[in-house]
A protein has these predicted regions:
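Conserved, well-folded catalytic cores of nucleic-acid-processing
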Residues: 35, 176, 180, 199, ...
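Non-catalytic, mostly N-terminal accessory regions of nucleic-acid modification and defense proteins
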Residues: 1-224, 228-229, 291-300, 402-406, ...
């Protein structure tokens, strides 16, 4: 027993130490990012910090790859010290394995070393980024590397009004990113570059308001969605997010399952070019090989890119809330096999359930989809009610979870999670009221680990808990006119103070009796005095 306690304490201490070091890393990174931007808006400046961090990562990743192999034969080998001509011999094999090639002179460490004396640093960097992308031309990795540096404009006025000012700012960025002691943190088991990148994106998103919320889902929500989608699955063929943003939801599956248990990889589609690039960079930074991620640019509803793929075992998404779409203005969509089963298209002013139907059509028979939804889709009438009726009658709705308000960047609305399955064991739907499962941190609410665990265990156990969750069958949902709002099925706890009217009445009667007795005593005393 003592041994187990000792091991548990050691594990807790390691976790605490890792958390402290992670916080230290985060504080350092954000301080550097803020100092670098100066008067430039943080949202506009993010491309430079994130882009140069990525450049450092791929440089070190590639150099370490060669050093690790060559030092088995020659302990003094250093890829960064080779001439470009000497390194050319490994170009082909490097592209096959890593997806791109960086000659020694173009590595981050060497560019950083020469930066203070390079009066054309912006030109140097632009040429390097162009050559990195060109190295993948004609290779299987081409689509995953092409345009990765497109948003990193080293000649932008955001860096300075003159050539010299821009070079000075770029030098400072290189020195700041290069000065981060990221290697020290790797000893703590922290996925340093990936962790730093996700932290920076979260901070930029939180400071950007609505625009930030469009590309980044908070980590704690991403983790909950992934674990719900993975219930009863120890491995999956692949995972899909049709509105993948920066890719944080997809990457949760690597963290929860391990990359080897996502056999065919990570699939996503993103409509915004900048966010699409952020997502691909995020994949590389989390050491996902180019052959295992398939992120494409385009409109998911009108131009789906993964329709020929085999169905997905896991689908997770946080689609844009009540965004407009073409809807029935395009009559061809009514014949689209994604939407036609419901017999109606989602309304033009709110595409939420169009995304839901799209995901359902891509889901495998043994798979699970976990989707963040705007609450209006649960109760609005018209076409959305007809789609809900279809989903209920076909027994696709496994669970509806009401989330706390103010969880997401850019909106304070209380959203919900809709869980879809094609292989339900019975016709019941679980409704969970998790609206109070949060801890307030600053201006936002957070789903802490205990909150996430409570929601997940409730989903897994599927047992009714008064005032927290309830099961409803098809008939009951039909009686509620296919309204899927959680408060229709989970009775709210009455927290008002209950006043016992009988108790004060009893006290009043007792006071009256005492008052009467005192009067009688007083009358007796007065009579005695008169005698």
């Amino acid at each position: 027993m003592e041994n187990k306690n000792t091991q548990a304490n050691e594990k807790n201490n390691e976790h605490a130490s890792s958390s402290l070091e992670r916080n230290e890393l985060h504080n350092t990174i954000w301080k550097v990012a803020n100092e670098l931007r100066g008067s430039v808006d943080g949202w506009d400046f993010k491309q430079y910090v994130l882009g140069i961090l990525f450049y450092r990562y791929i440089s070190e990743n590639m150099a370490n790859h060669h050093n690790e192999y060559e030092r088995k034969l020659d302990p003094s080998f250093d890829y960064a010290s080779l001439s470009d001509e000497e390194a050319e011999i490994v170009r082909k094999s490097t592209i096959e394995e890593k997806g791109f090639f960086i000659p020694p002179s173009a590595l981050f460490c060497n560019v950083l070393k020469n930066a203070p004396h390079n009066e054309d640093l912006n030109v140097t960097l632009q040429n390097i980024f162009t050559e990195i992308e060109k190295s993948s031309l004609g290779a299987p990795s081409e689509e995953n590397v092409k345009g990765l540096f497109a948003d990193l404009d080293v000649n932008s006025n955001k860096l300075g009004s003159s050539h010299q000012n821009r070079v000075e700012k770029l030098t400072k960025i290189l020195q700041a990113i290069g000065g981060m002691q990221l290697g020290d943190y790797q000893q703590s088991g922290i996925d340093v570059f990936g962790d730093a990148y996700e932290y920076l994106m979260a901070m930029y998103a939180s400071n950007a308001g609505k625009s930030g919320g469009e590309f980044f889902t908070p980590q704690e929500v991403s983790e909950l969605l992934a674990k719900i989608a993975l219930h009863n699955q120890e491995s999956i063929n692949k995972v899909y997010d049709p509105c993948c943003g920066s890719g944080s939801l997809l990457l949760q599956f690597s963290k929860v399952l391990g990359d080897k248990n996502v056999s065919k990889g990570y699939f996503g589609q993103e409509i915004n070019l900048t966010t699409y690039n952020l997502c691909r960079i995020n994949m590389f930074l989390h050491d996902i090989n180019y052959s295992k991620f398939h992120i494409v640019l385009g409109d998911t509803l009108l131009d789906p890119k993964h329709e020929d793929d085999e169905p997905f075992d896991a689908i997770v998404s946080n689609p844009p809330y009540s965004t407009k779409w073409v809807g029935d203005n395009n009559p061809l969509l009514m014949n689209d096999e994604r939407f036609s089963p419901a017999g109606v298209l989602a309304p033009k002013k709110a595409a939420d359930l169009a995304f839901t139907m799209h995901m359902l059509s891509y889901l495998s028979n043994q798979g699970t989809a976990a989707i963040v939804e705007f609450p209006g889709v649960l109760y609005r009438d018209g076409a959305e009610k007809k789609i809900r009726e279809y989903l209920v009658k076909e027994n696709f709705i496994d669970c509806v979870i009401a989330l706390p308000e103010n969880l997401f960047f850019g909106t304070s609305i209380a959203t919900c999670i809709l869980v879809l399955k094609k292989n339900k064991k019975d016709d019941t739907t679980l409704f969970i009221d998790a609206s109070k499962e949060f801890v307030k941190e600053g201006k936002k609410n957070k789903l802490k680990e205990r909150n996430r665990e409570k929601i997940l265990q409730t989903y897994i156990e599927r047992k009714e808990v008064k005032h927290f969750c309830a099961l409803a069958n098809m008939e009951e949902i039909k009686e509620n006119d296919y309204n899927l709002s959680v408060n229709r099925y989970v009775e709210q706890e009455d927290t008002k103070e209950i006043i016992d009217i009988k108790a004060p009445n009893g006290e009043i009667a007792q006071i009256v009796r005492k008052q009467s007795a005192l009067r009688n005593s007083l009358d007796f005393i007065i009579k005695e005095l008169e005698i």
